Amino acid sequence: MRAATHGAQLPYQLLAGVVPARGGWLVASAKWQGATIAPQEPEVIGEFIDILDYKPAYRVIAVFTPIGLLEEPRAKGRSCEREARRVLGVPRASAIASAPPRAALAASTYEEAVEASGGHLSPIRWRQIAKIAEVDKVIAPYWQRTVFEVHPELSFFQLAEDRPLRYPKRTQVGIEEREEILRARLPGAERILGATLPGVSKSQLNDAAACLWTARRIAARTVSRLPEDPEWDALGLRMEIVR
């Protein structure tokens, strides 16, 4: 539900954790002021541009989608992805899929995308390629004051005090492991975790809540970024993952 501003300055700022979902983007938002965070009911918003145009505007949008892409394929992907795998270690490192190069976004088939990616593209990234293209189309460098690439597994690593989680996120034990951490560390998390939305899974709700937790860290300027000295893509976008 959108808050009415009536031209007045709000006593809080809006934060959002965003993950791709069927029918659009799952948004877990919260009102934030100082030490207080109040999660709102999650919702699915159809297009990413509508999140950017949301009123009142989000102070931070932490999105689980690559921002900044290579022009040519590179073994093991962007430096931020290689660094993220190093941080997570085995076996959770496998959760970090390499982003496709920009040329792959125009592919109409998986085979074309694989060729544009230098012969390798994970099926996960192919399923996400339309979402990656949607973000790449609208993100300009100035948006990176507000919009940040995050990864839920890195968020959970931080939530668990620099400890990788034990179970894959889509298994029942993995879902419960993540819910337990979120309930302990994110005040009001149940409002997100207990939601029922068509086409949205429990693991997606967990991911969105974890991204929201990182959005609060970004707003509070306690976040770290991978790598510390990021690369820039051909469009002037920083290629980094924050946690």
What are these regions (language model features)?
Residues 2-243:
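RNase H-like (RuvC/DEDD) metal-dependent nuclease/polynucleotide-processing core
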